[in-house]
Amino acid sequence: VSPCKGHIESINRGERRILLSVVIAIENLSDNGINFIELHNKIKPEVEFVRKCLLDSGLWSSFLTRPYSKVPSPNSEPSSIFVTAMDTEPLCPDADLIINNNLDAFKEGVKKISLLTKGNVFTCKKKDSQIEIENFKTYEFNGPHPAGLAGTHMHFLDPPSIEKTVWSIGYQDVIAIGKLFVSGFLDIERVVSICGPLAKSPRLIKTYIGASLDDLLKNEFLNDSPCRVISGSVLSGNIAEGELSFLGRYSRQVTLIKEDEEKISFGWIKPQPNKFSIMPVLISAFRKSKLFNLTSNLNG
């Protein structure tokens, strides 16, 4: 399902004809498109109405199954649903800030997706978060990454298995679902962070699902150094270049780091106080307070 109205500019395929991307030139962003509530308001019961609206609007792809992290079958039902209302990825947006600015839509989204399961809806938030939803229990998690991952939450609250499938969904998709059932129209806006050592002005911006990063990042680079653009974080994102230079479906940030191909002769035998190291094999590992400008170089 296309997130907007427009005409197809190109269809890009990779090895073995795998589909890489479909490029759509947007004709009119102010056109809200189809009113899905008016289109399907005769469908009963309510769960089938919700399911049909999500499928036709394309928001069904907001859900991912565990195990396997696939978009669920339209006729399937999960044991439980996990709403990830927090984020611990490096340089990620503050989930609380975005949710509180769209709190009514978020609450409506949680209520609607709860119809898709007979089990629990686990809304997982960071410690001391003020997010509360009437008639739904919230669960707090604390600590560094991966404390904000849906897989971590599932491990402690309702572990999936071959016999039991659970679904996860991000907080911005829940907000979009809430807006769909309030207004009837698909909301394709997303808040993402432009971040990383090569970002000239790191900040949060509003953009659209699948936005062209070539357009989004004009005049956003700190200098002329070779740059690796990552849709997502440095831990879980994908390189966005060429036919894949677009904001990923589940990405909440765009990270800019230096494309570093420097090779150091006999680097393993030098103390290298200015090179980052996790293991205590370089002097820098003992300087806990020192900050490093990380690049794409894995240093072996």
Q: Locations of the language-model features?
A:
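Generic structural motif
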Residues: V1-S10
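Buried, small/hydrophobic-residue-enriched core segments of structured protein domains
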Residues: N12-D215, N219-G300
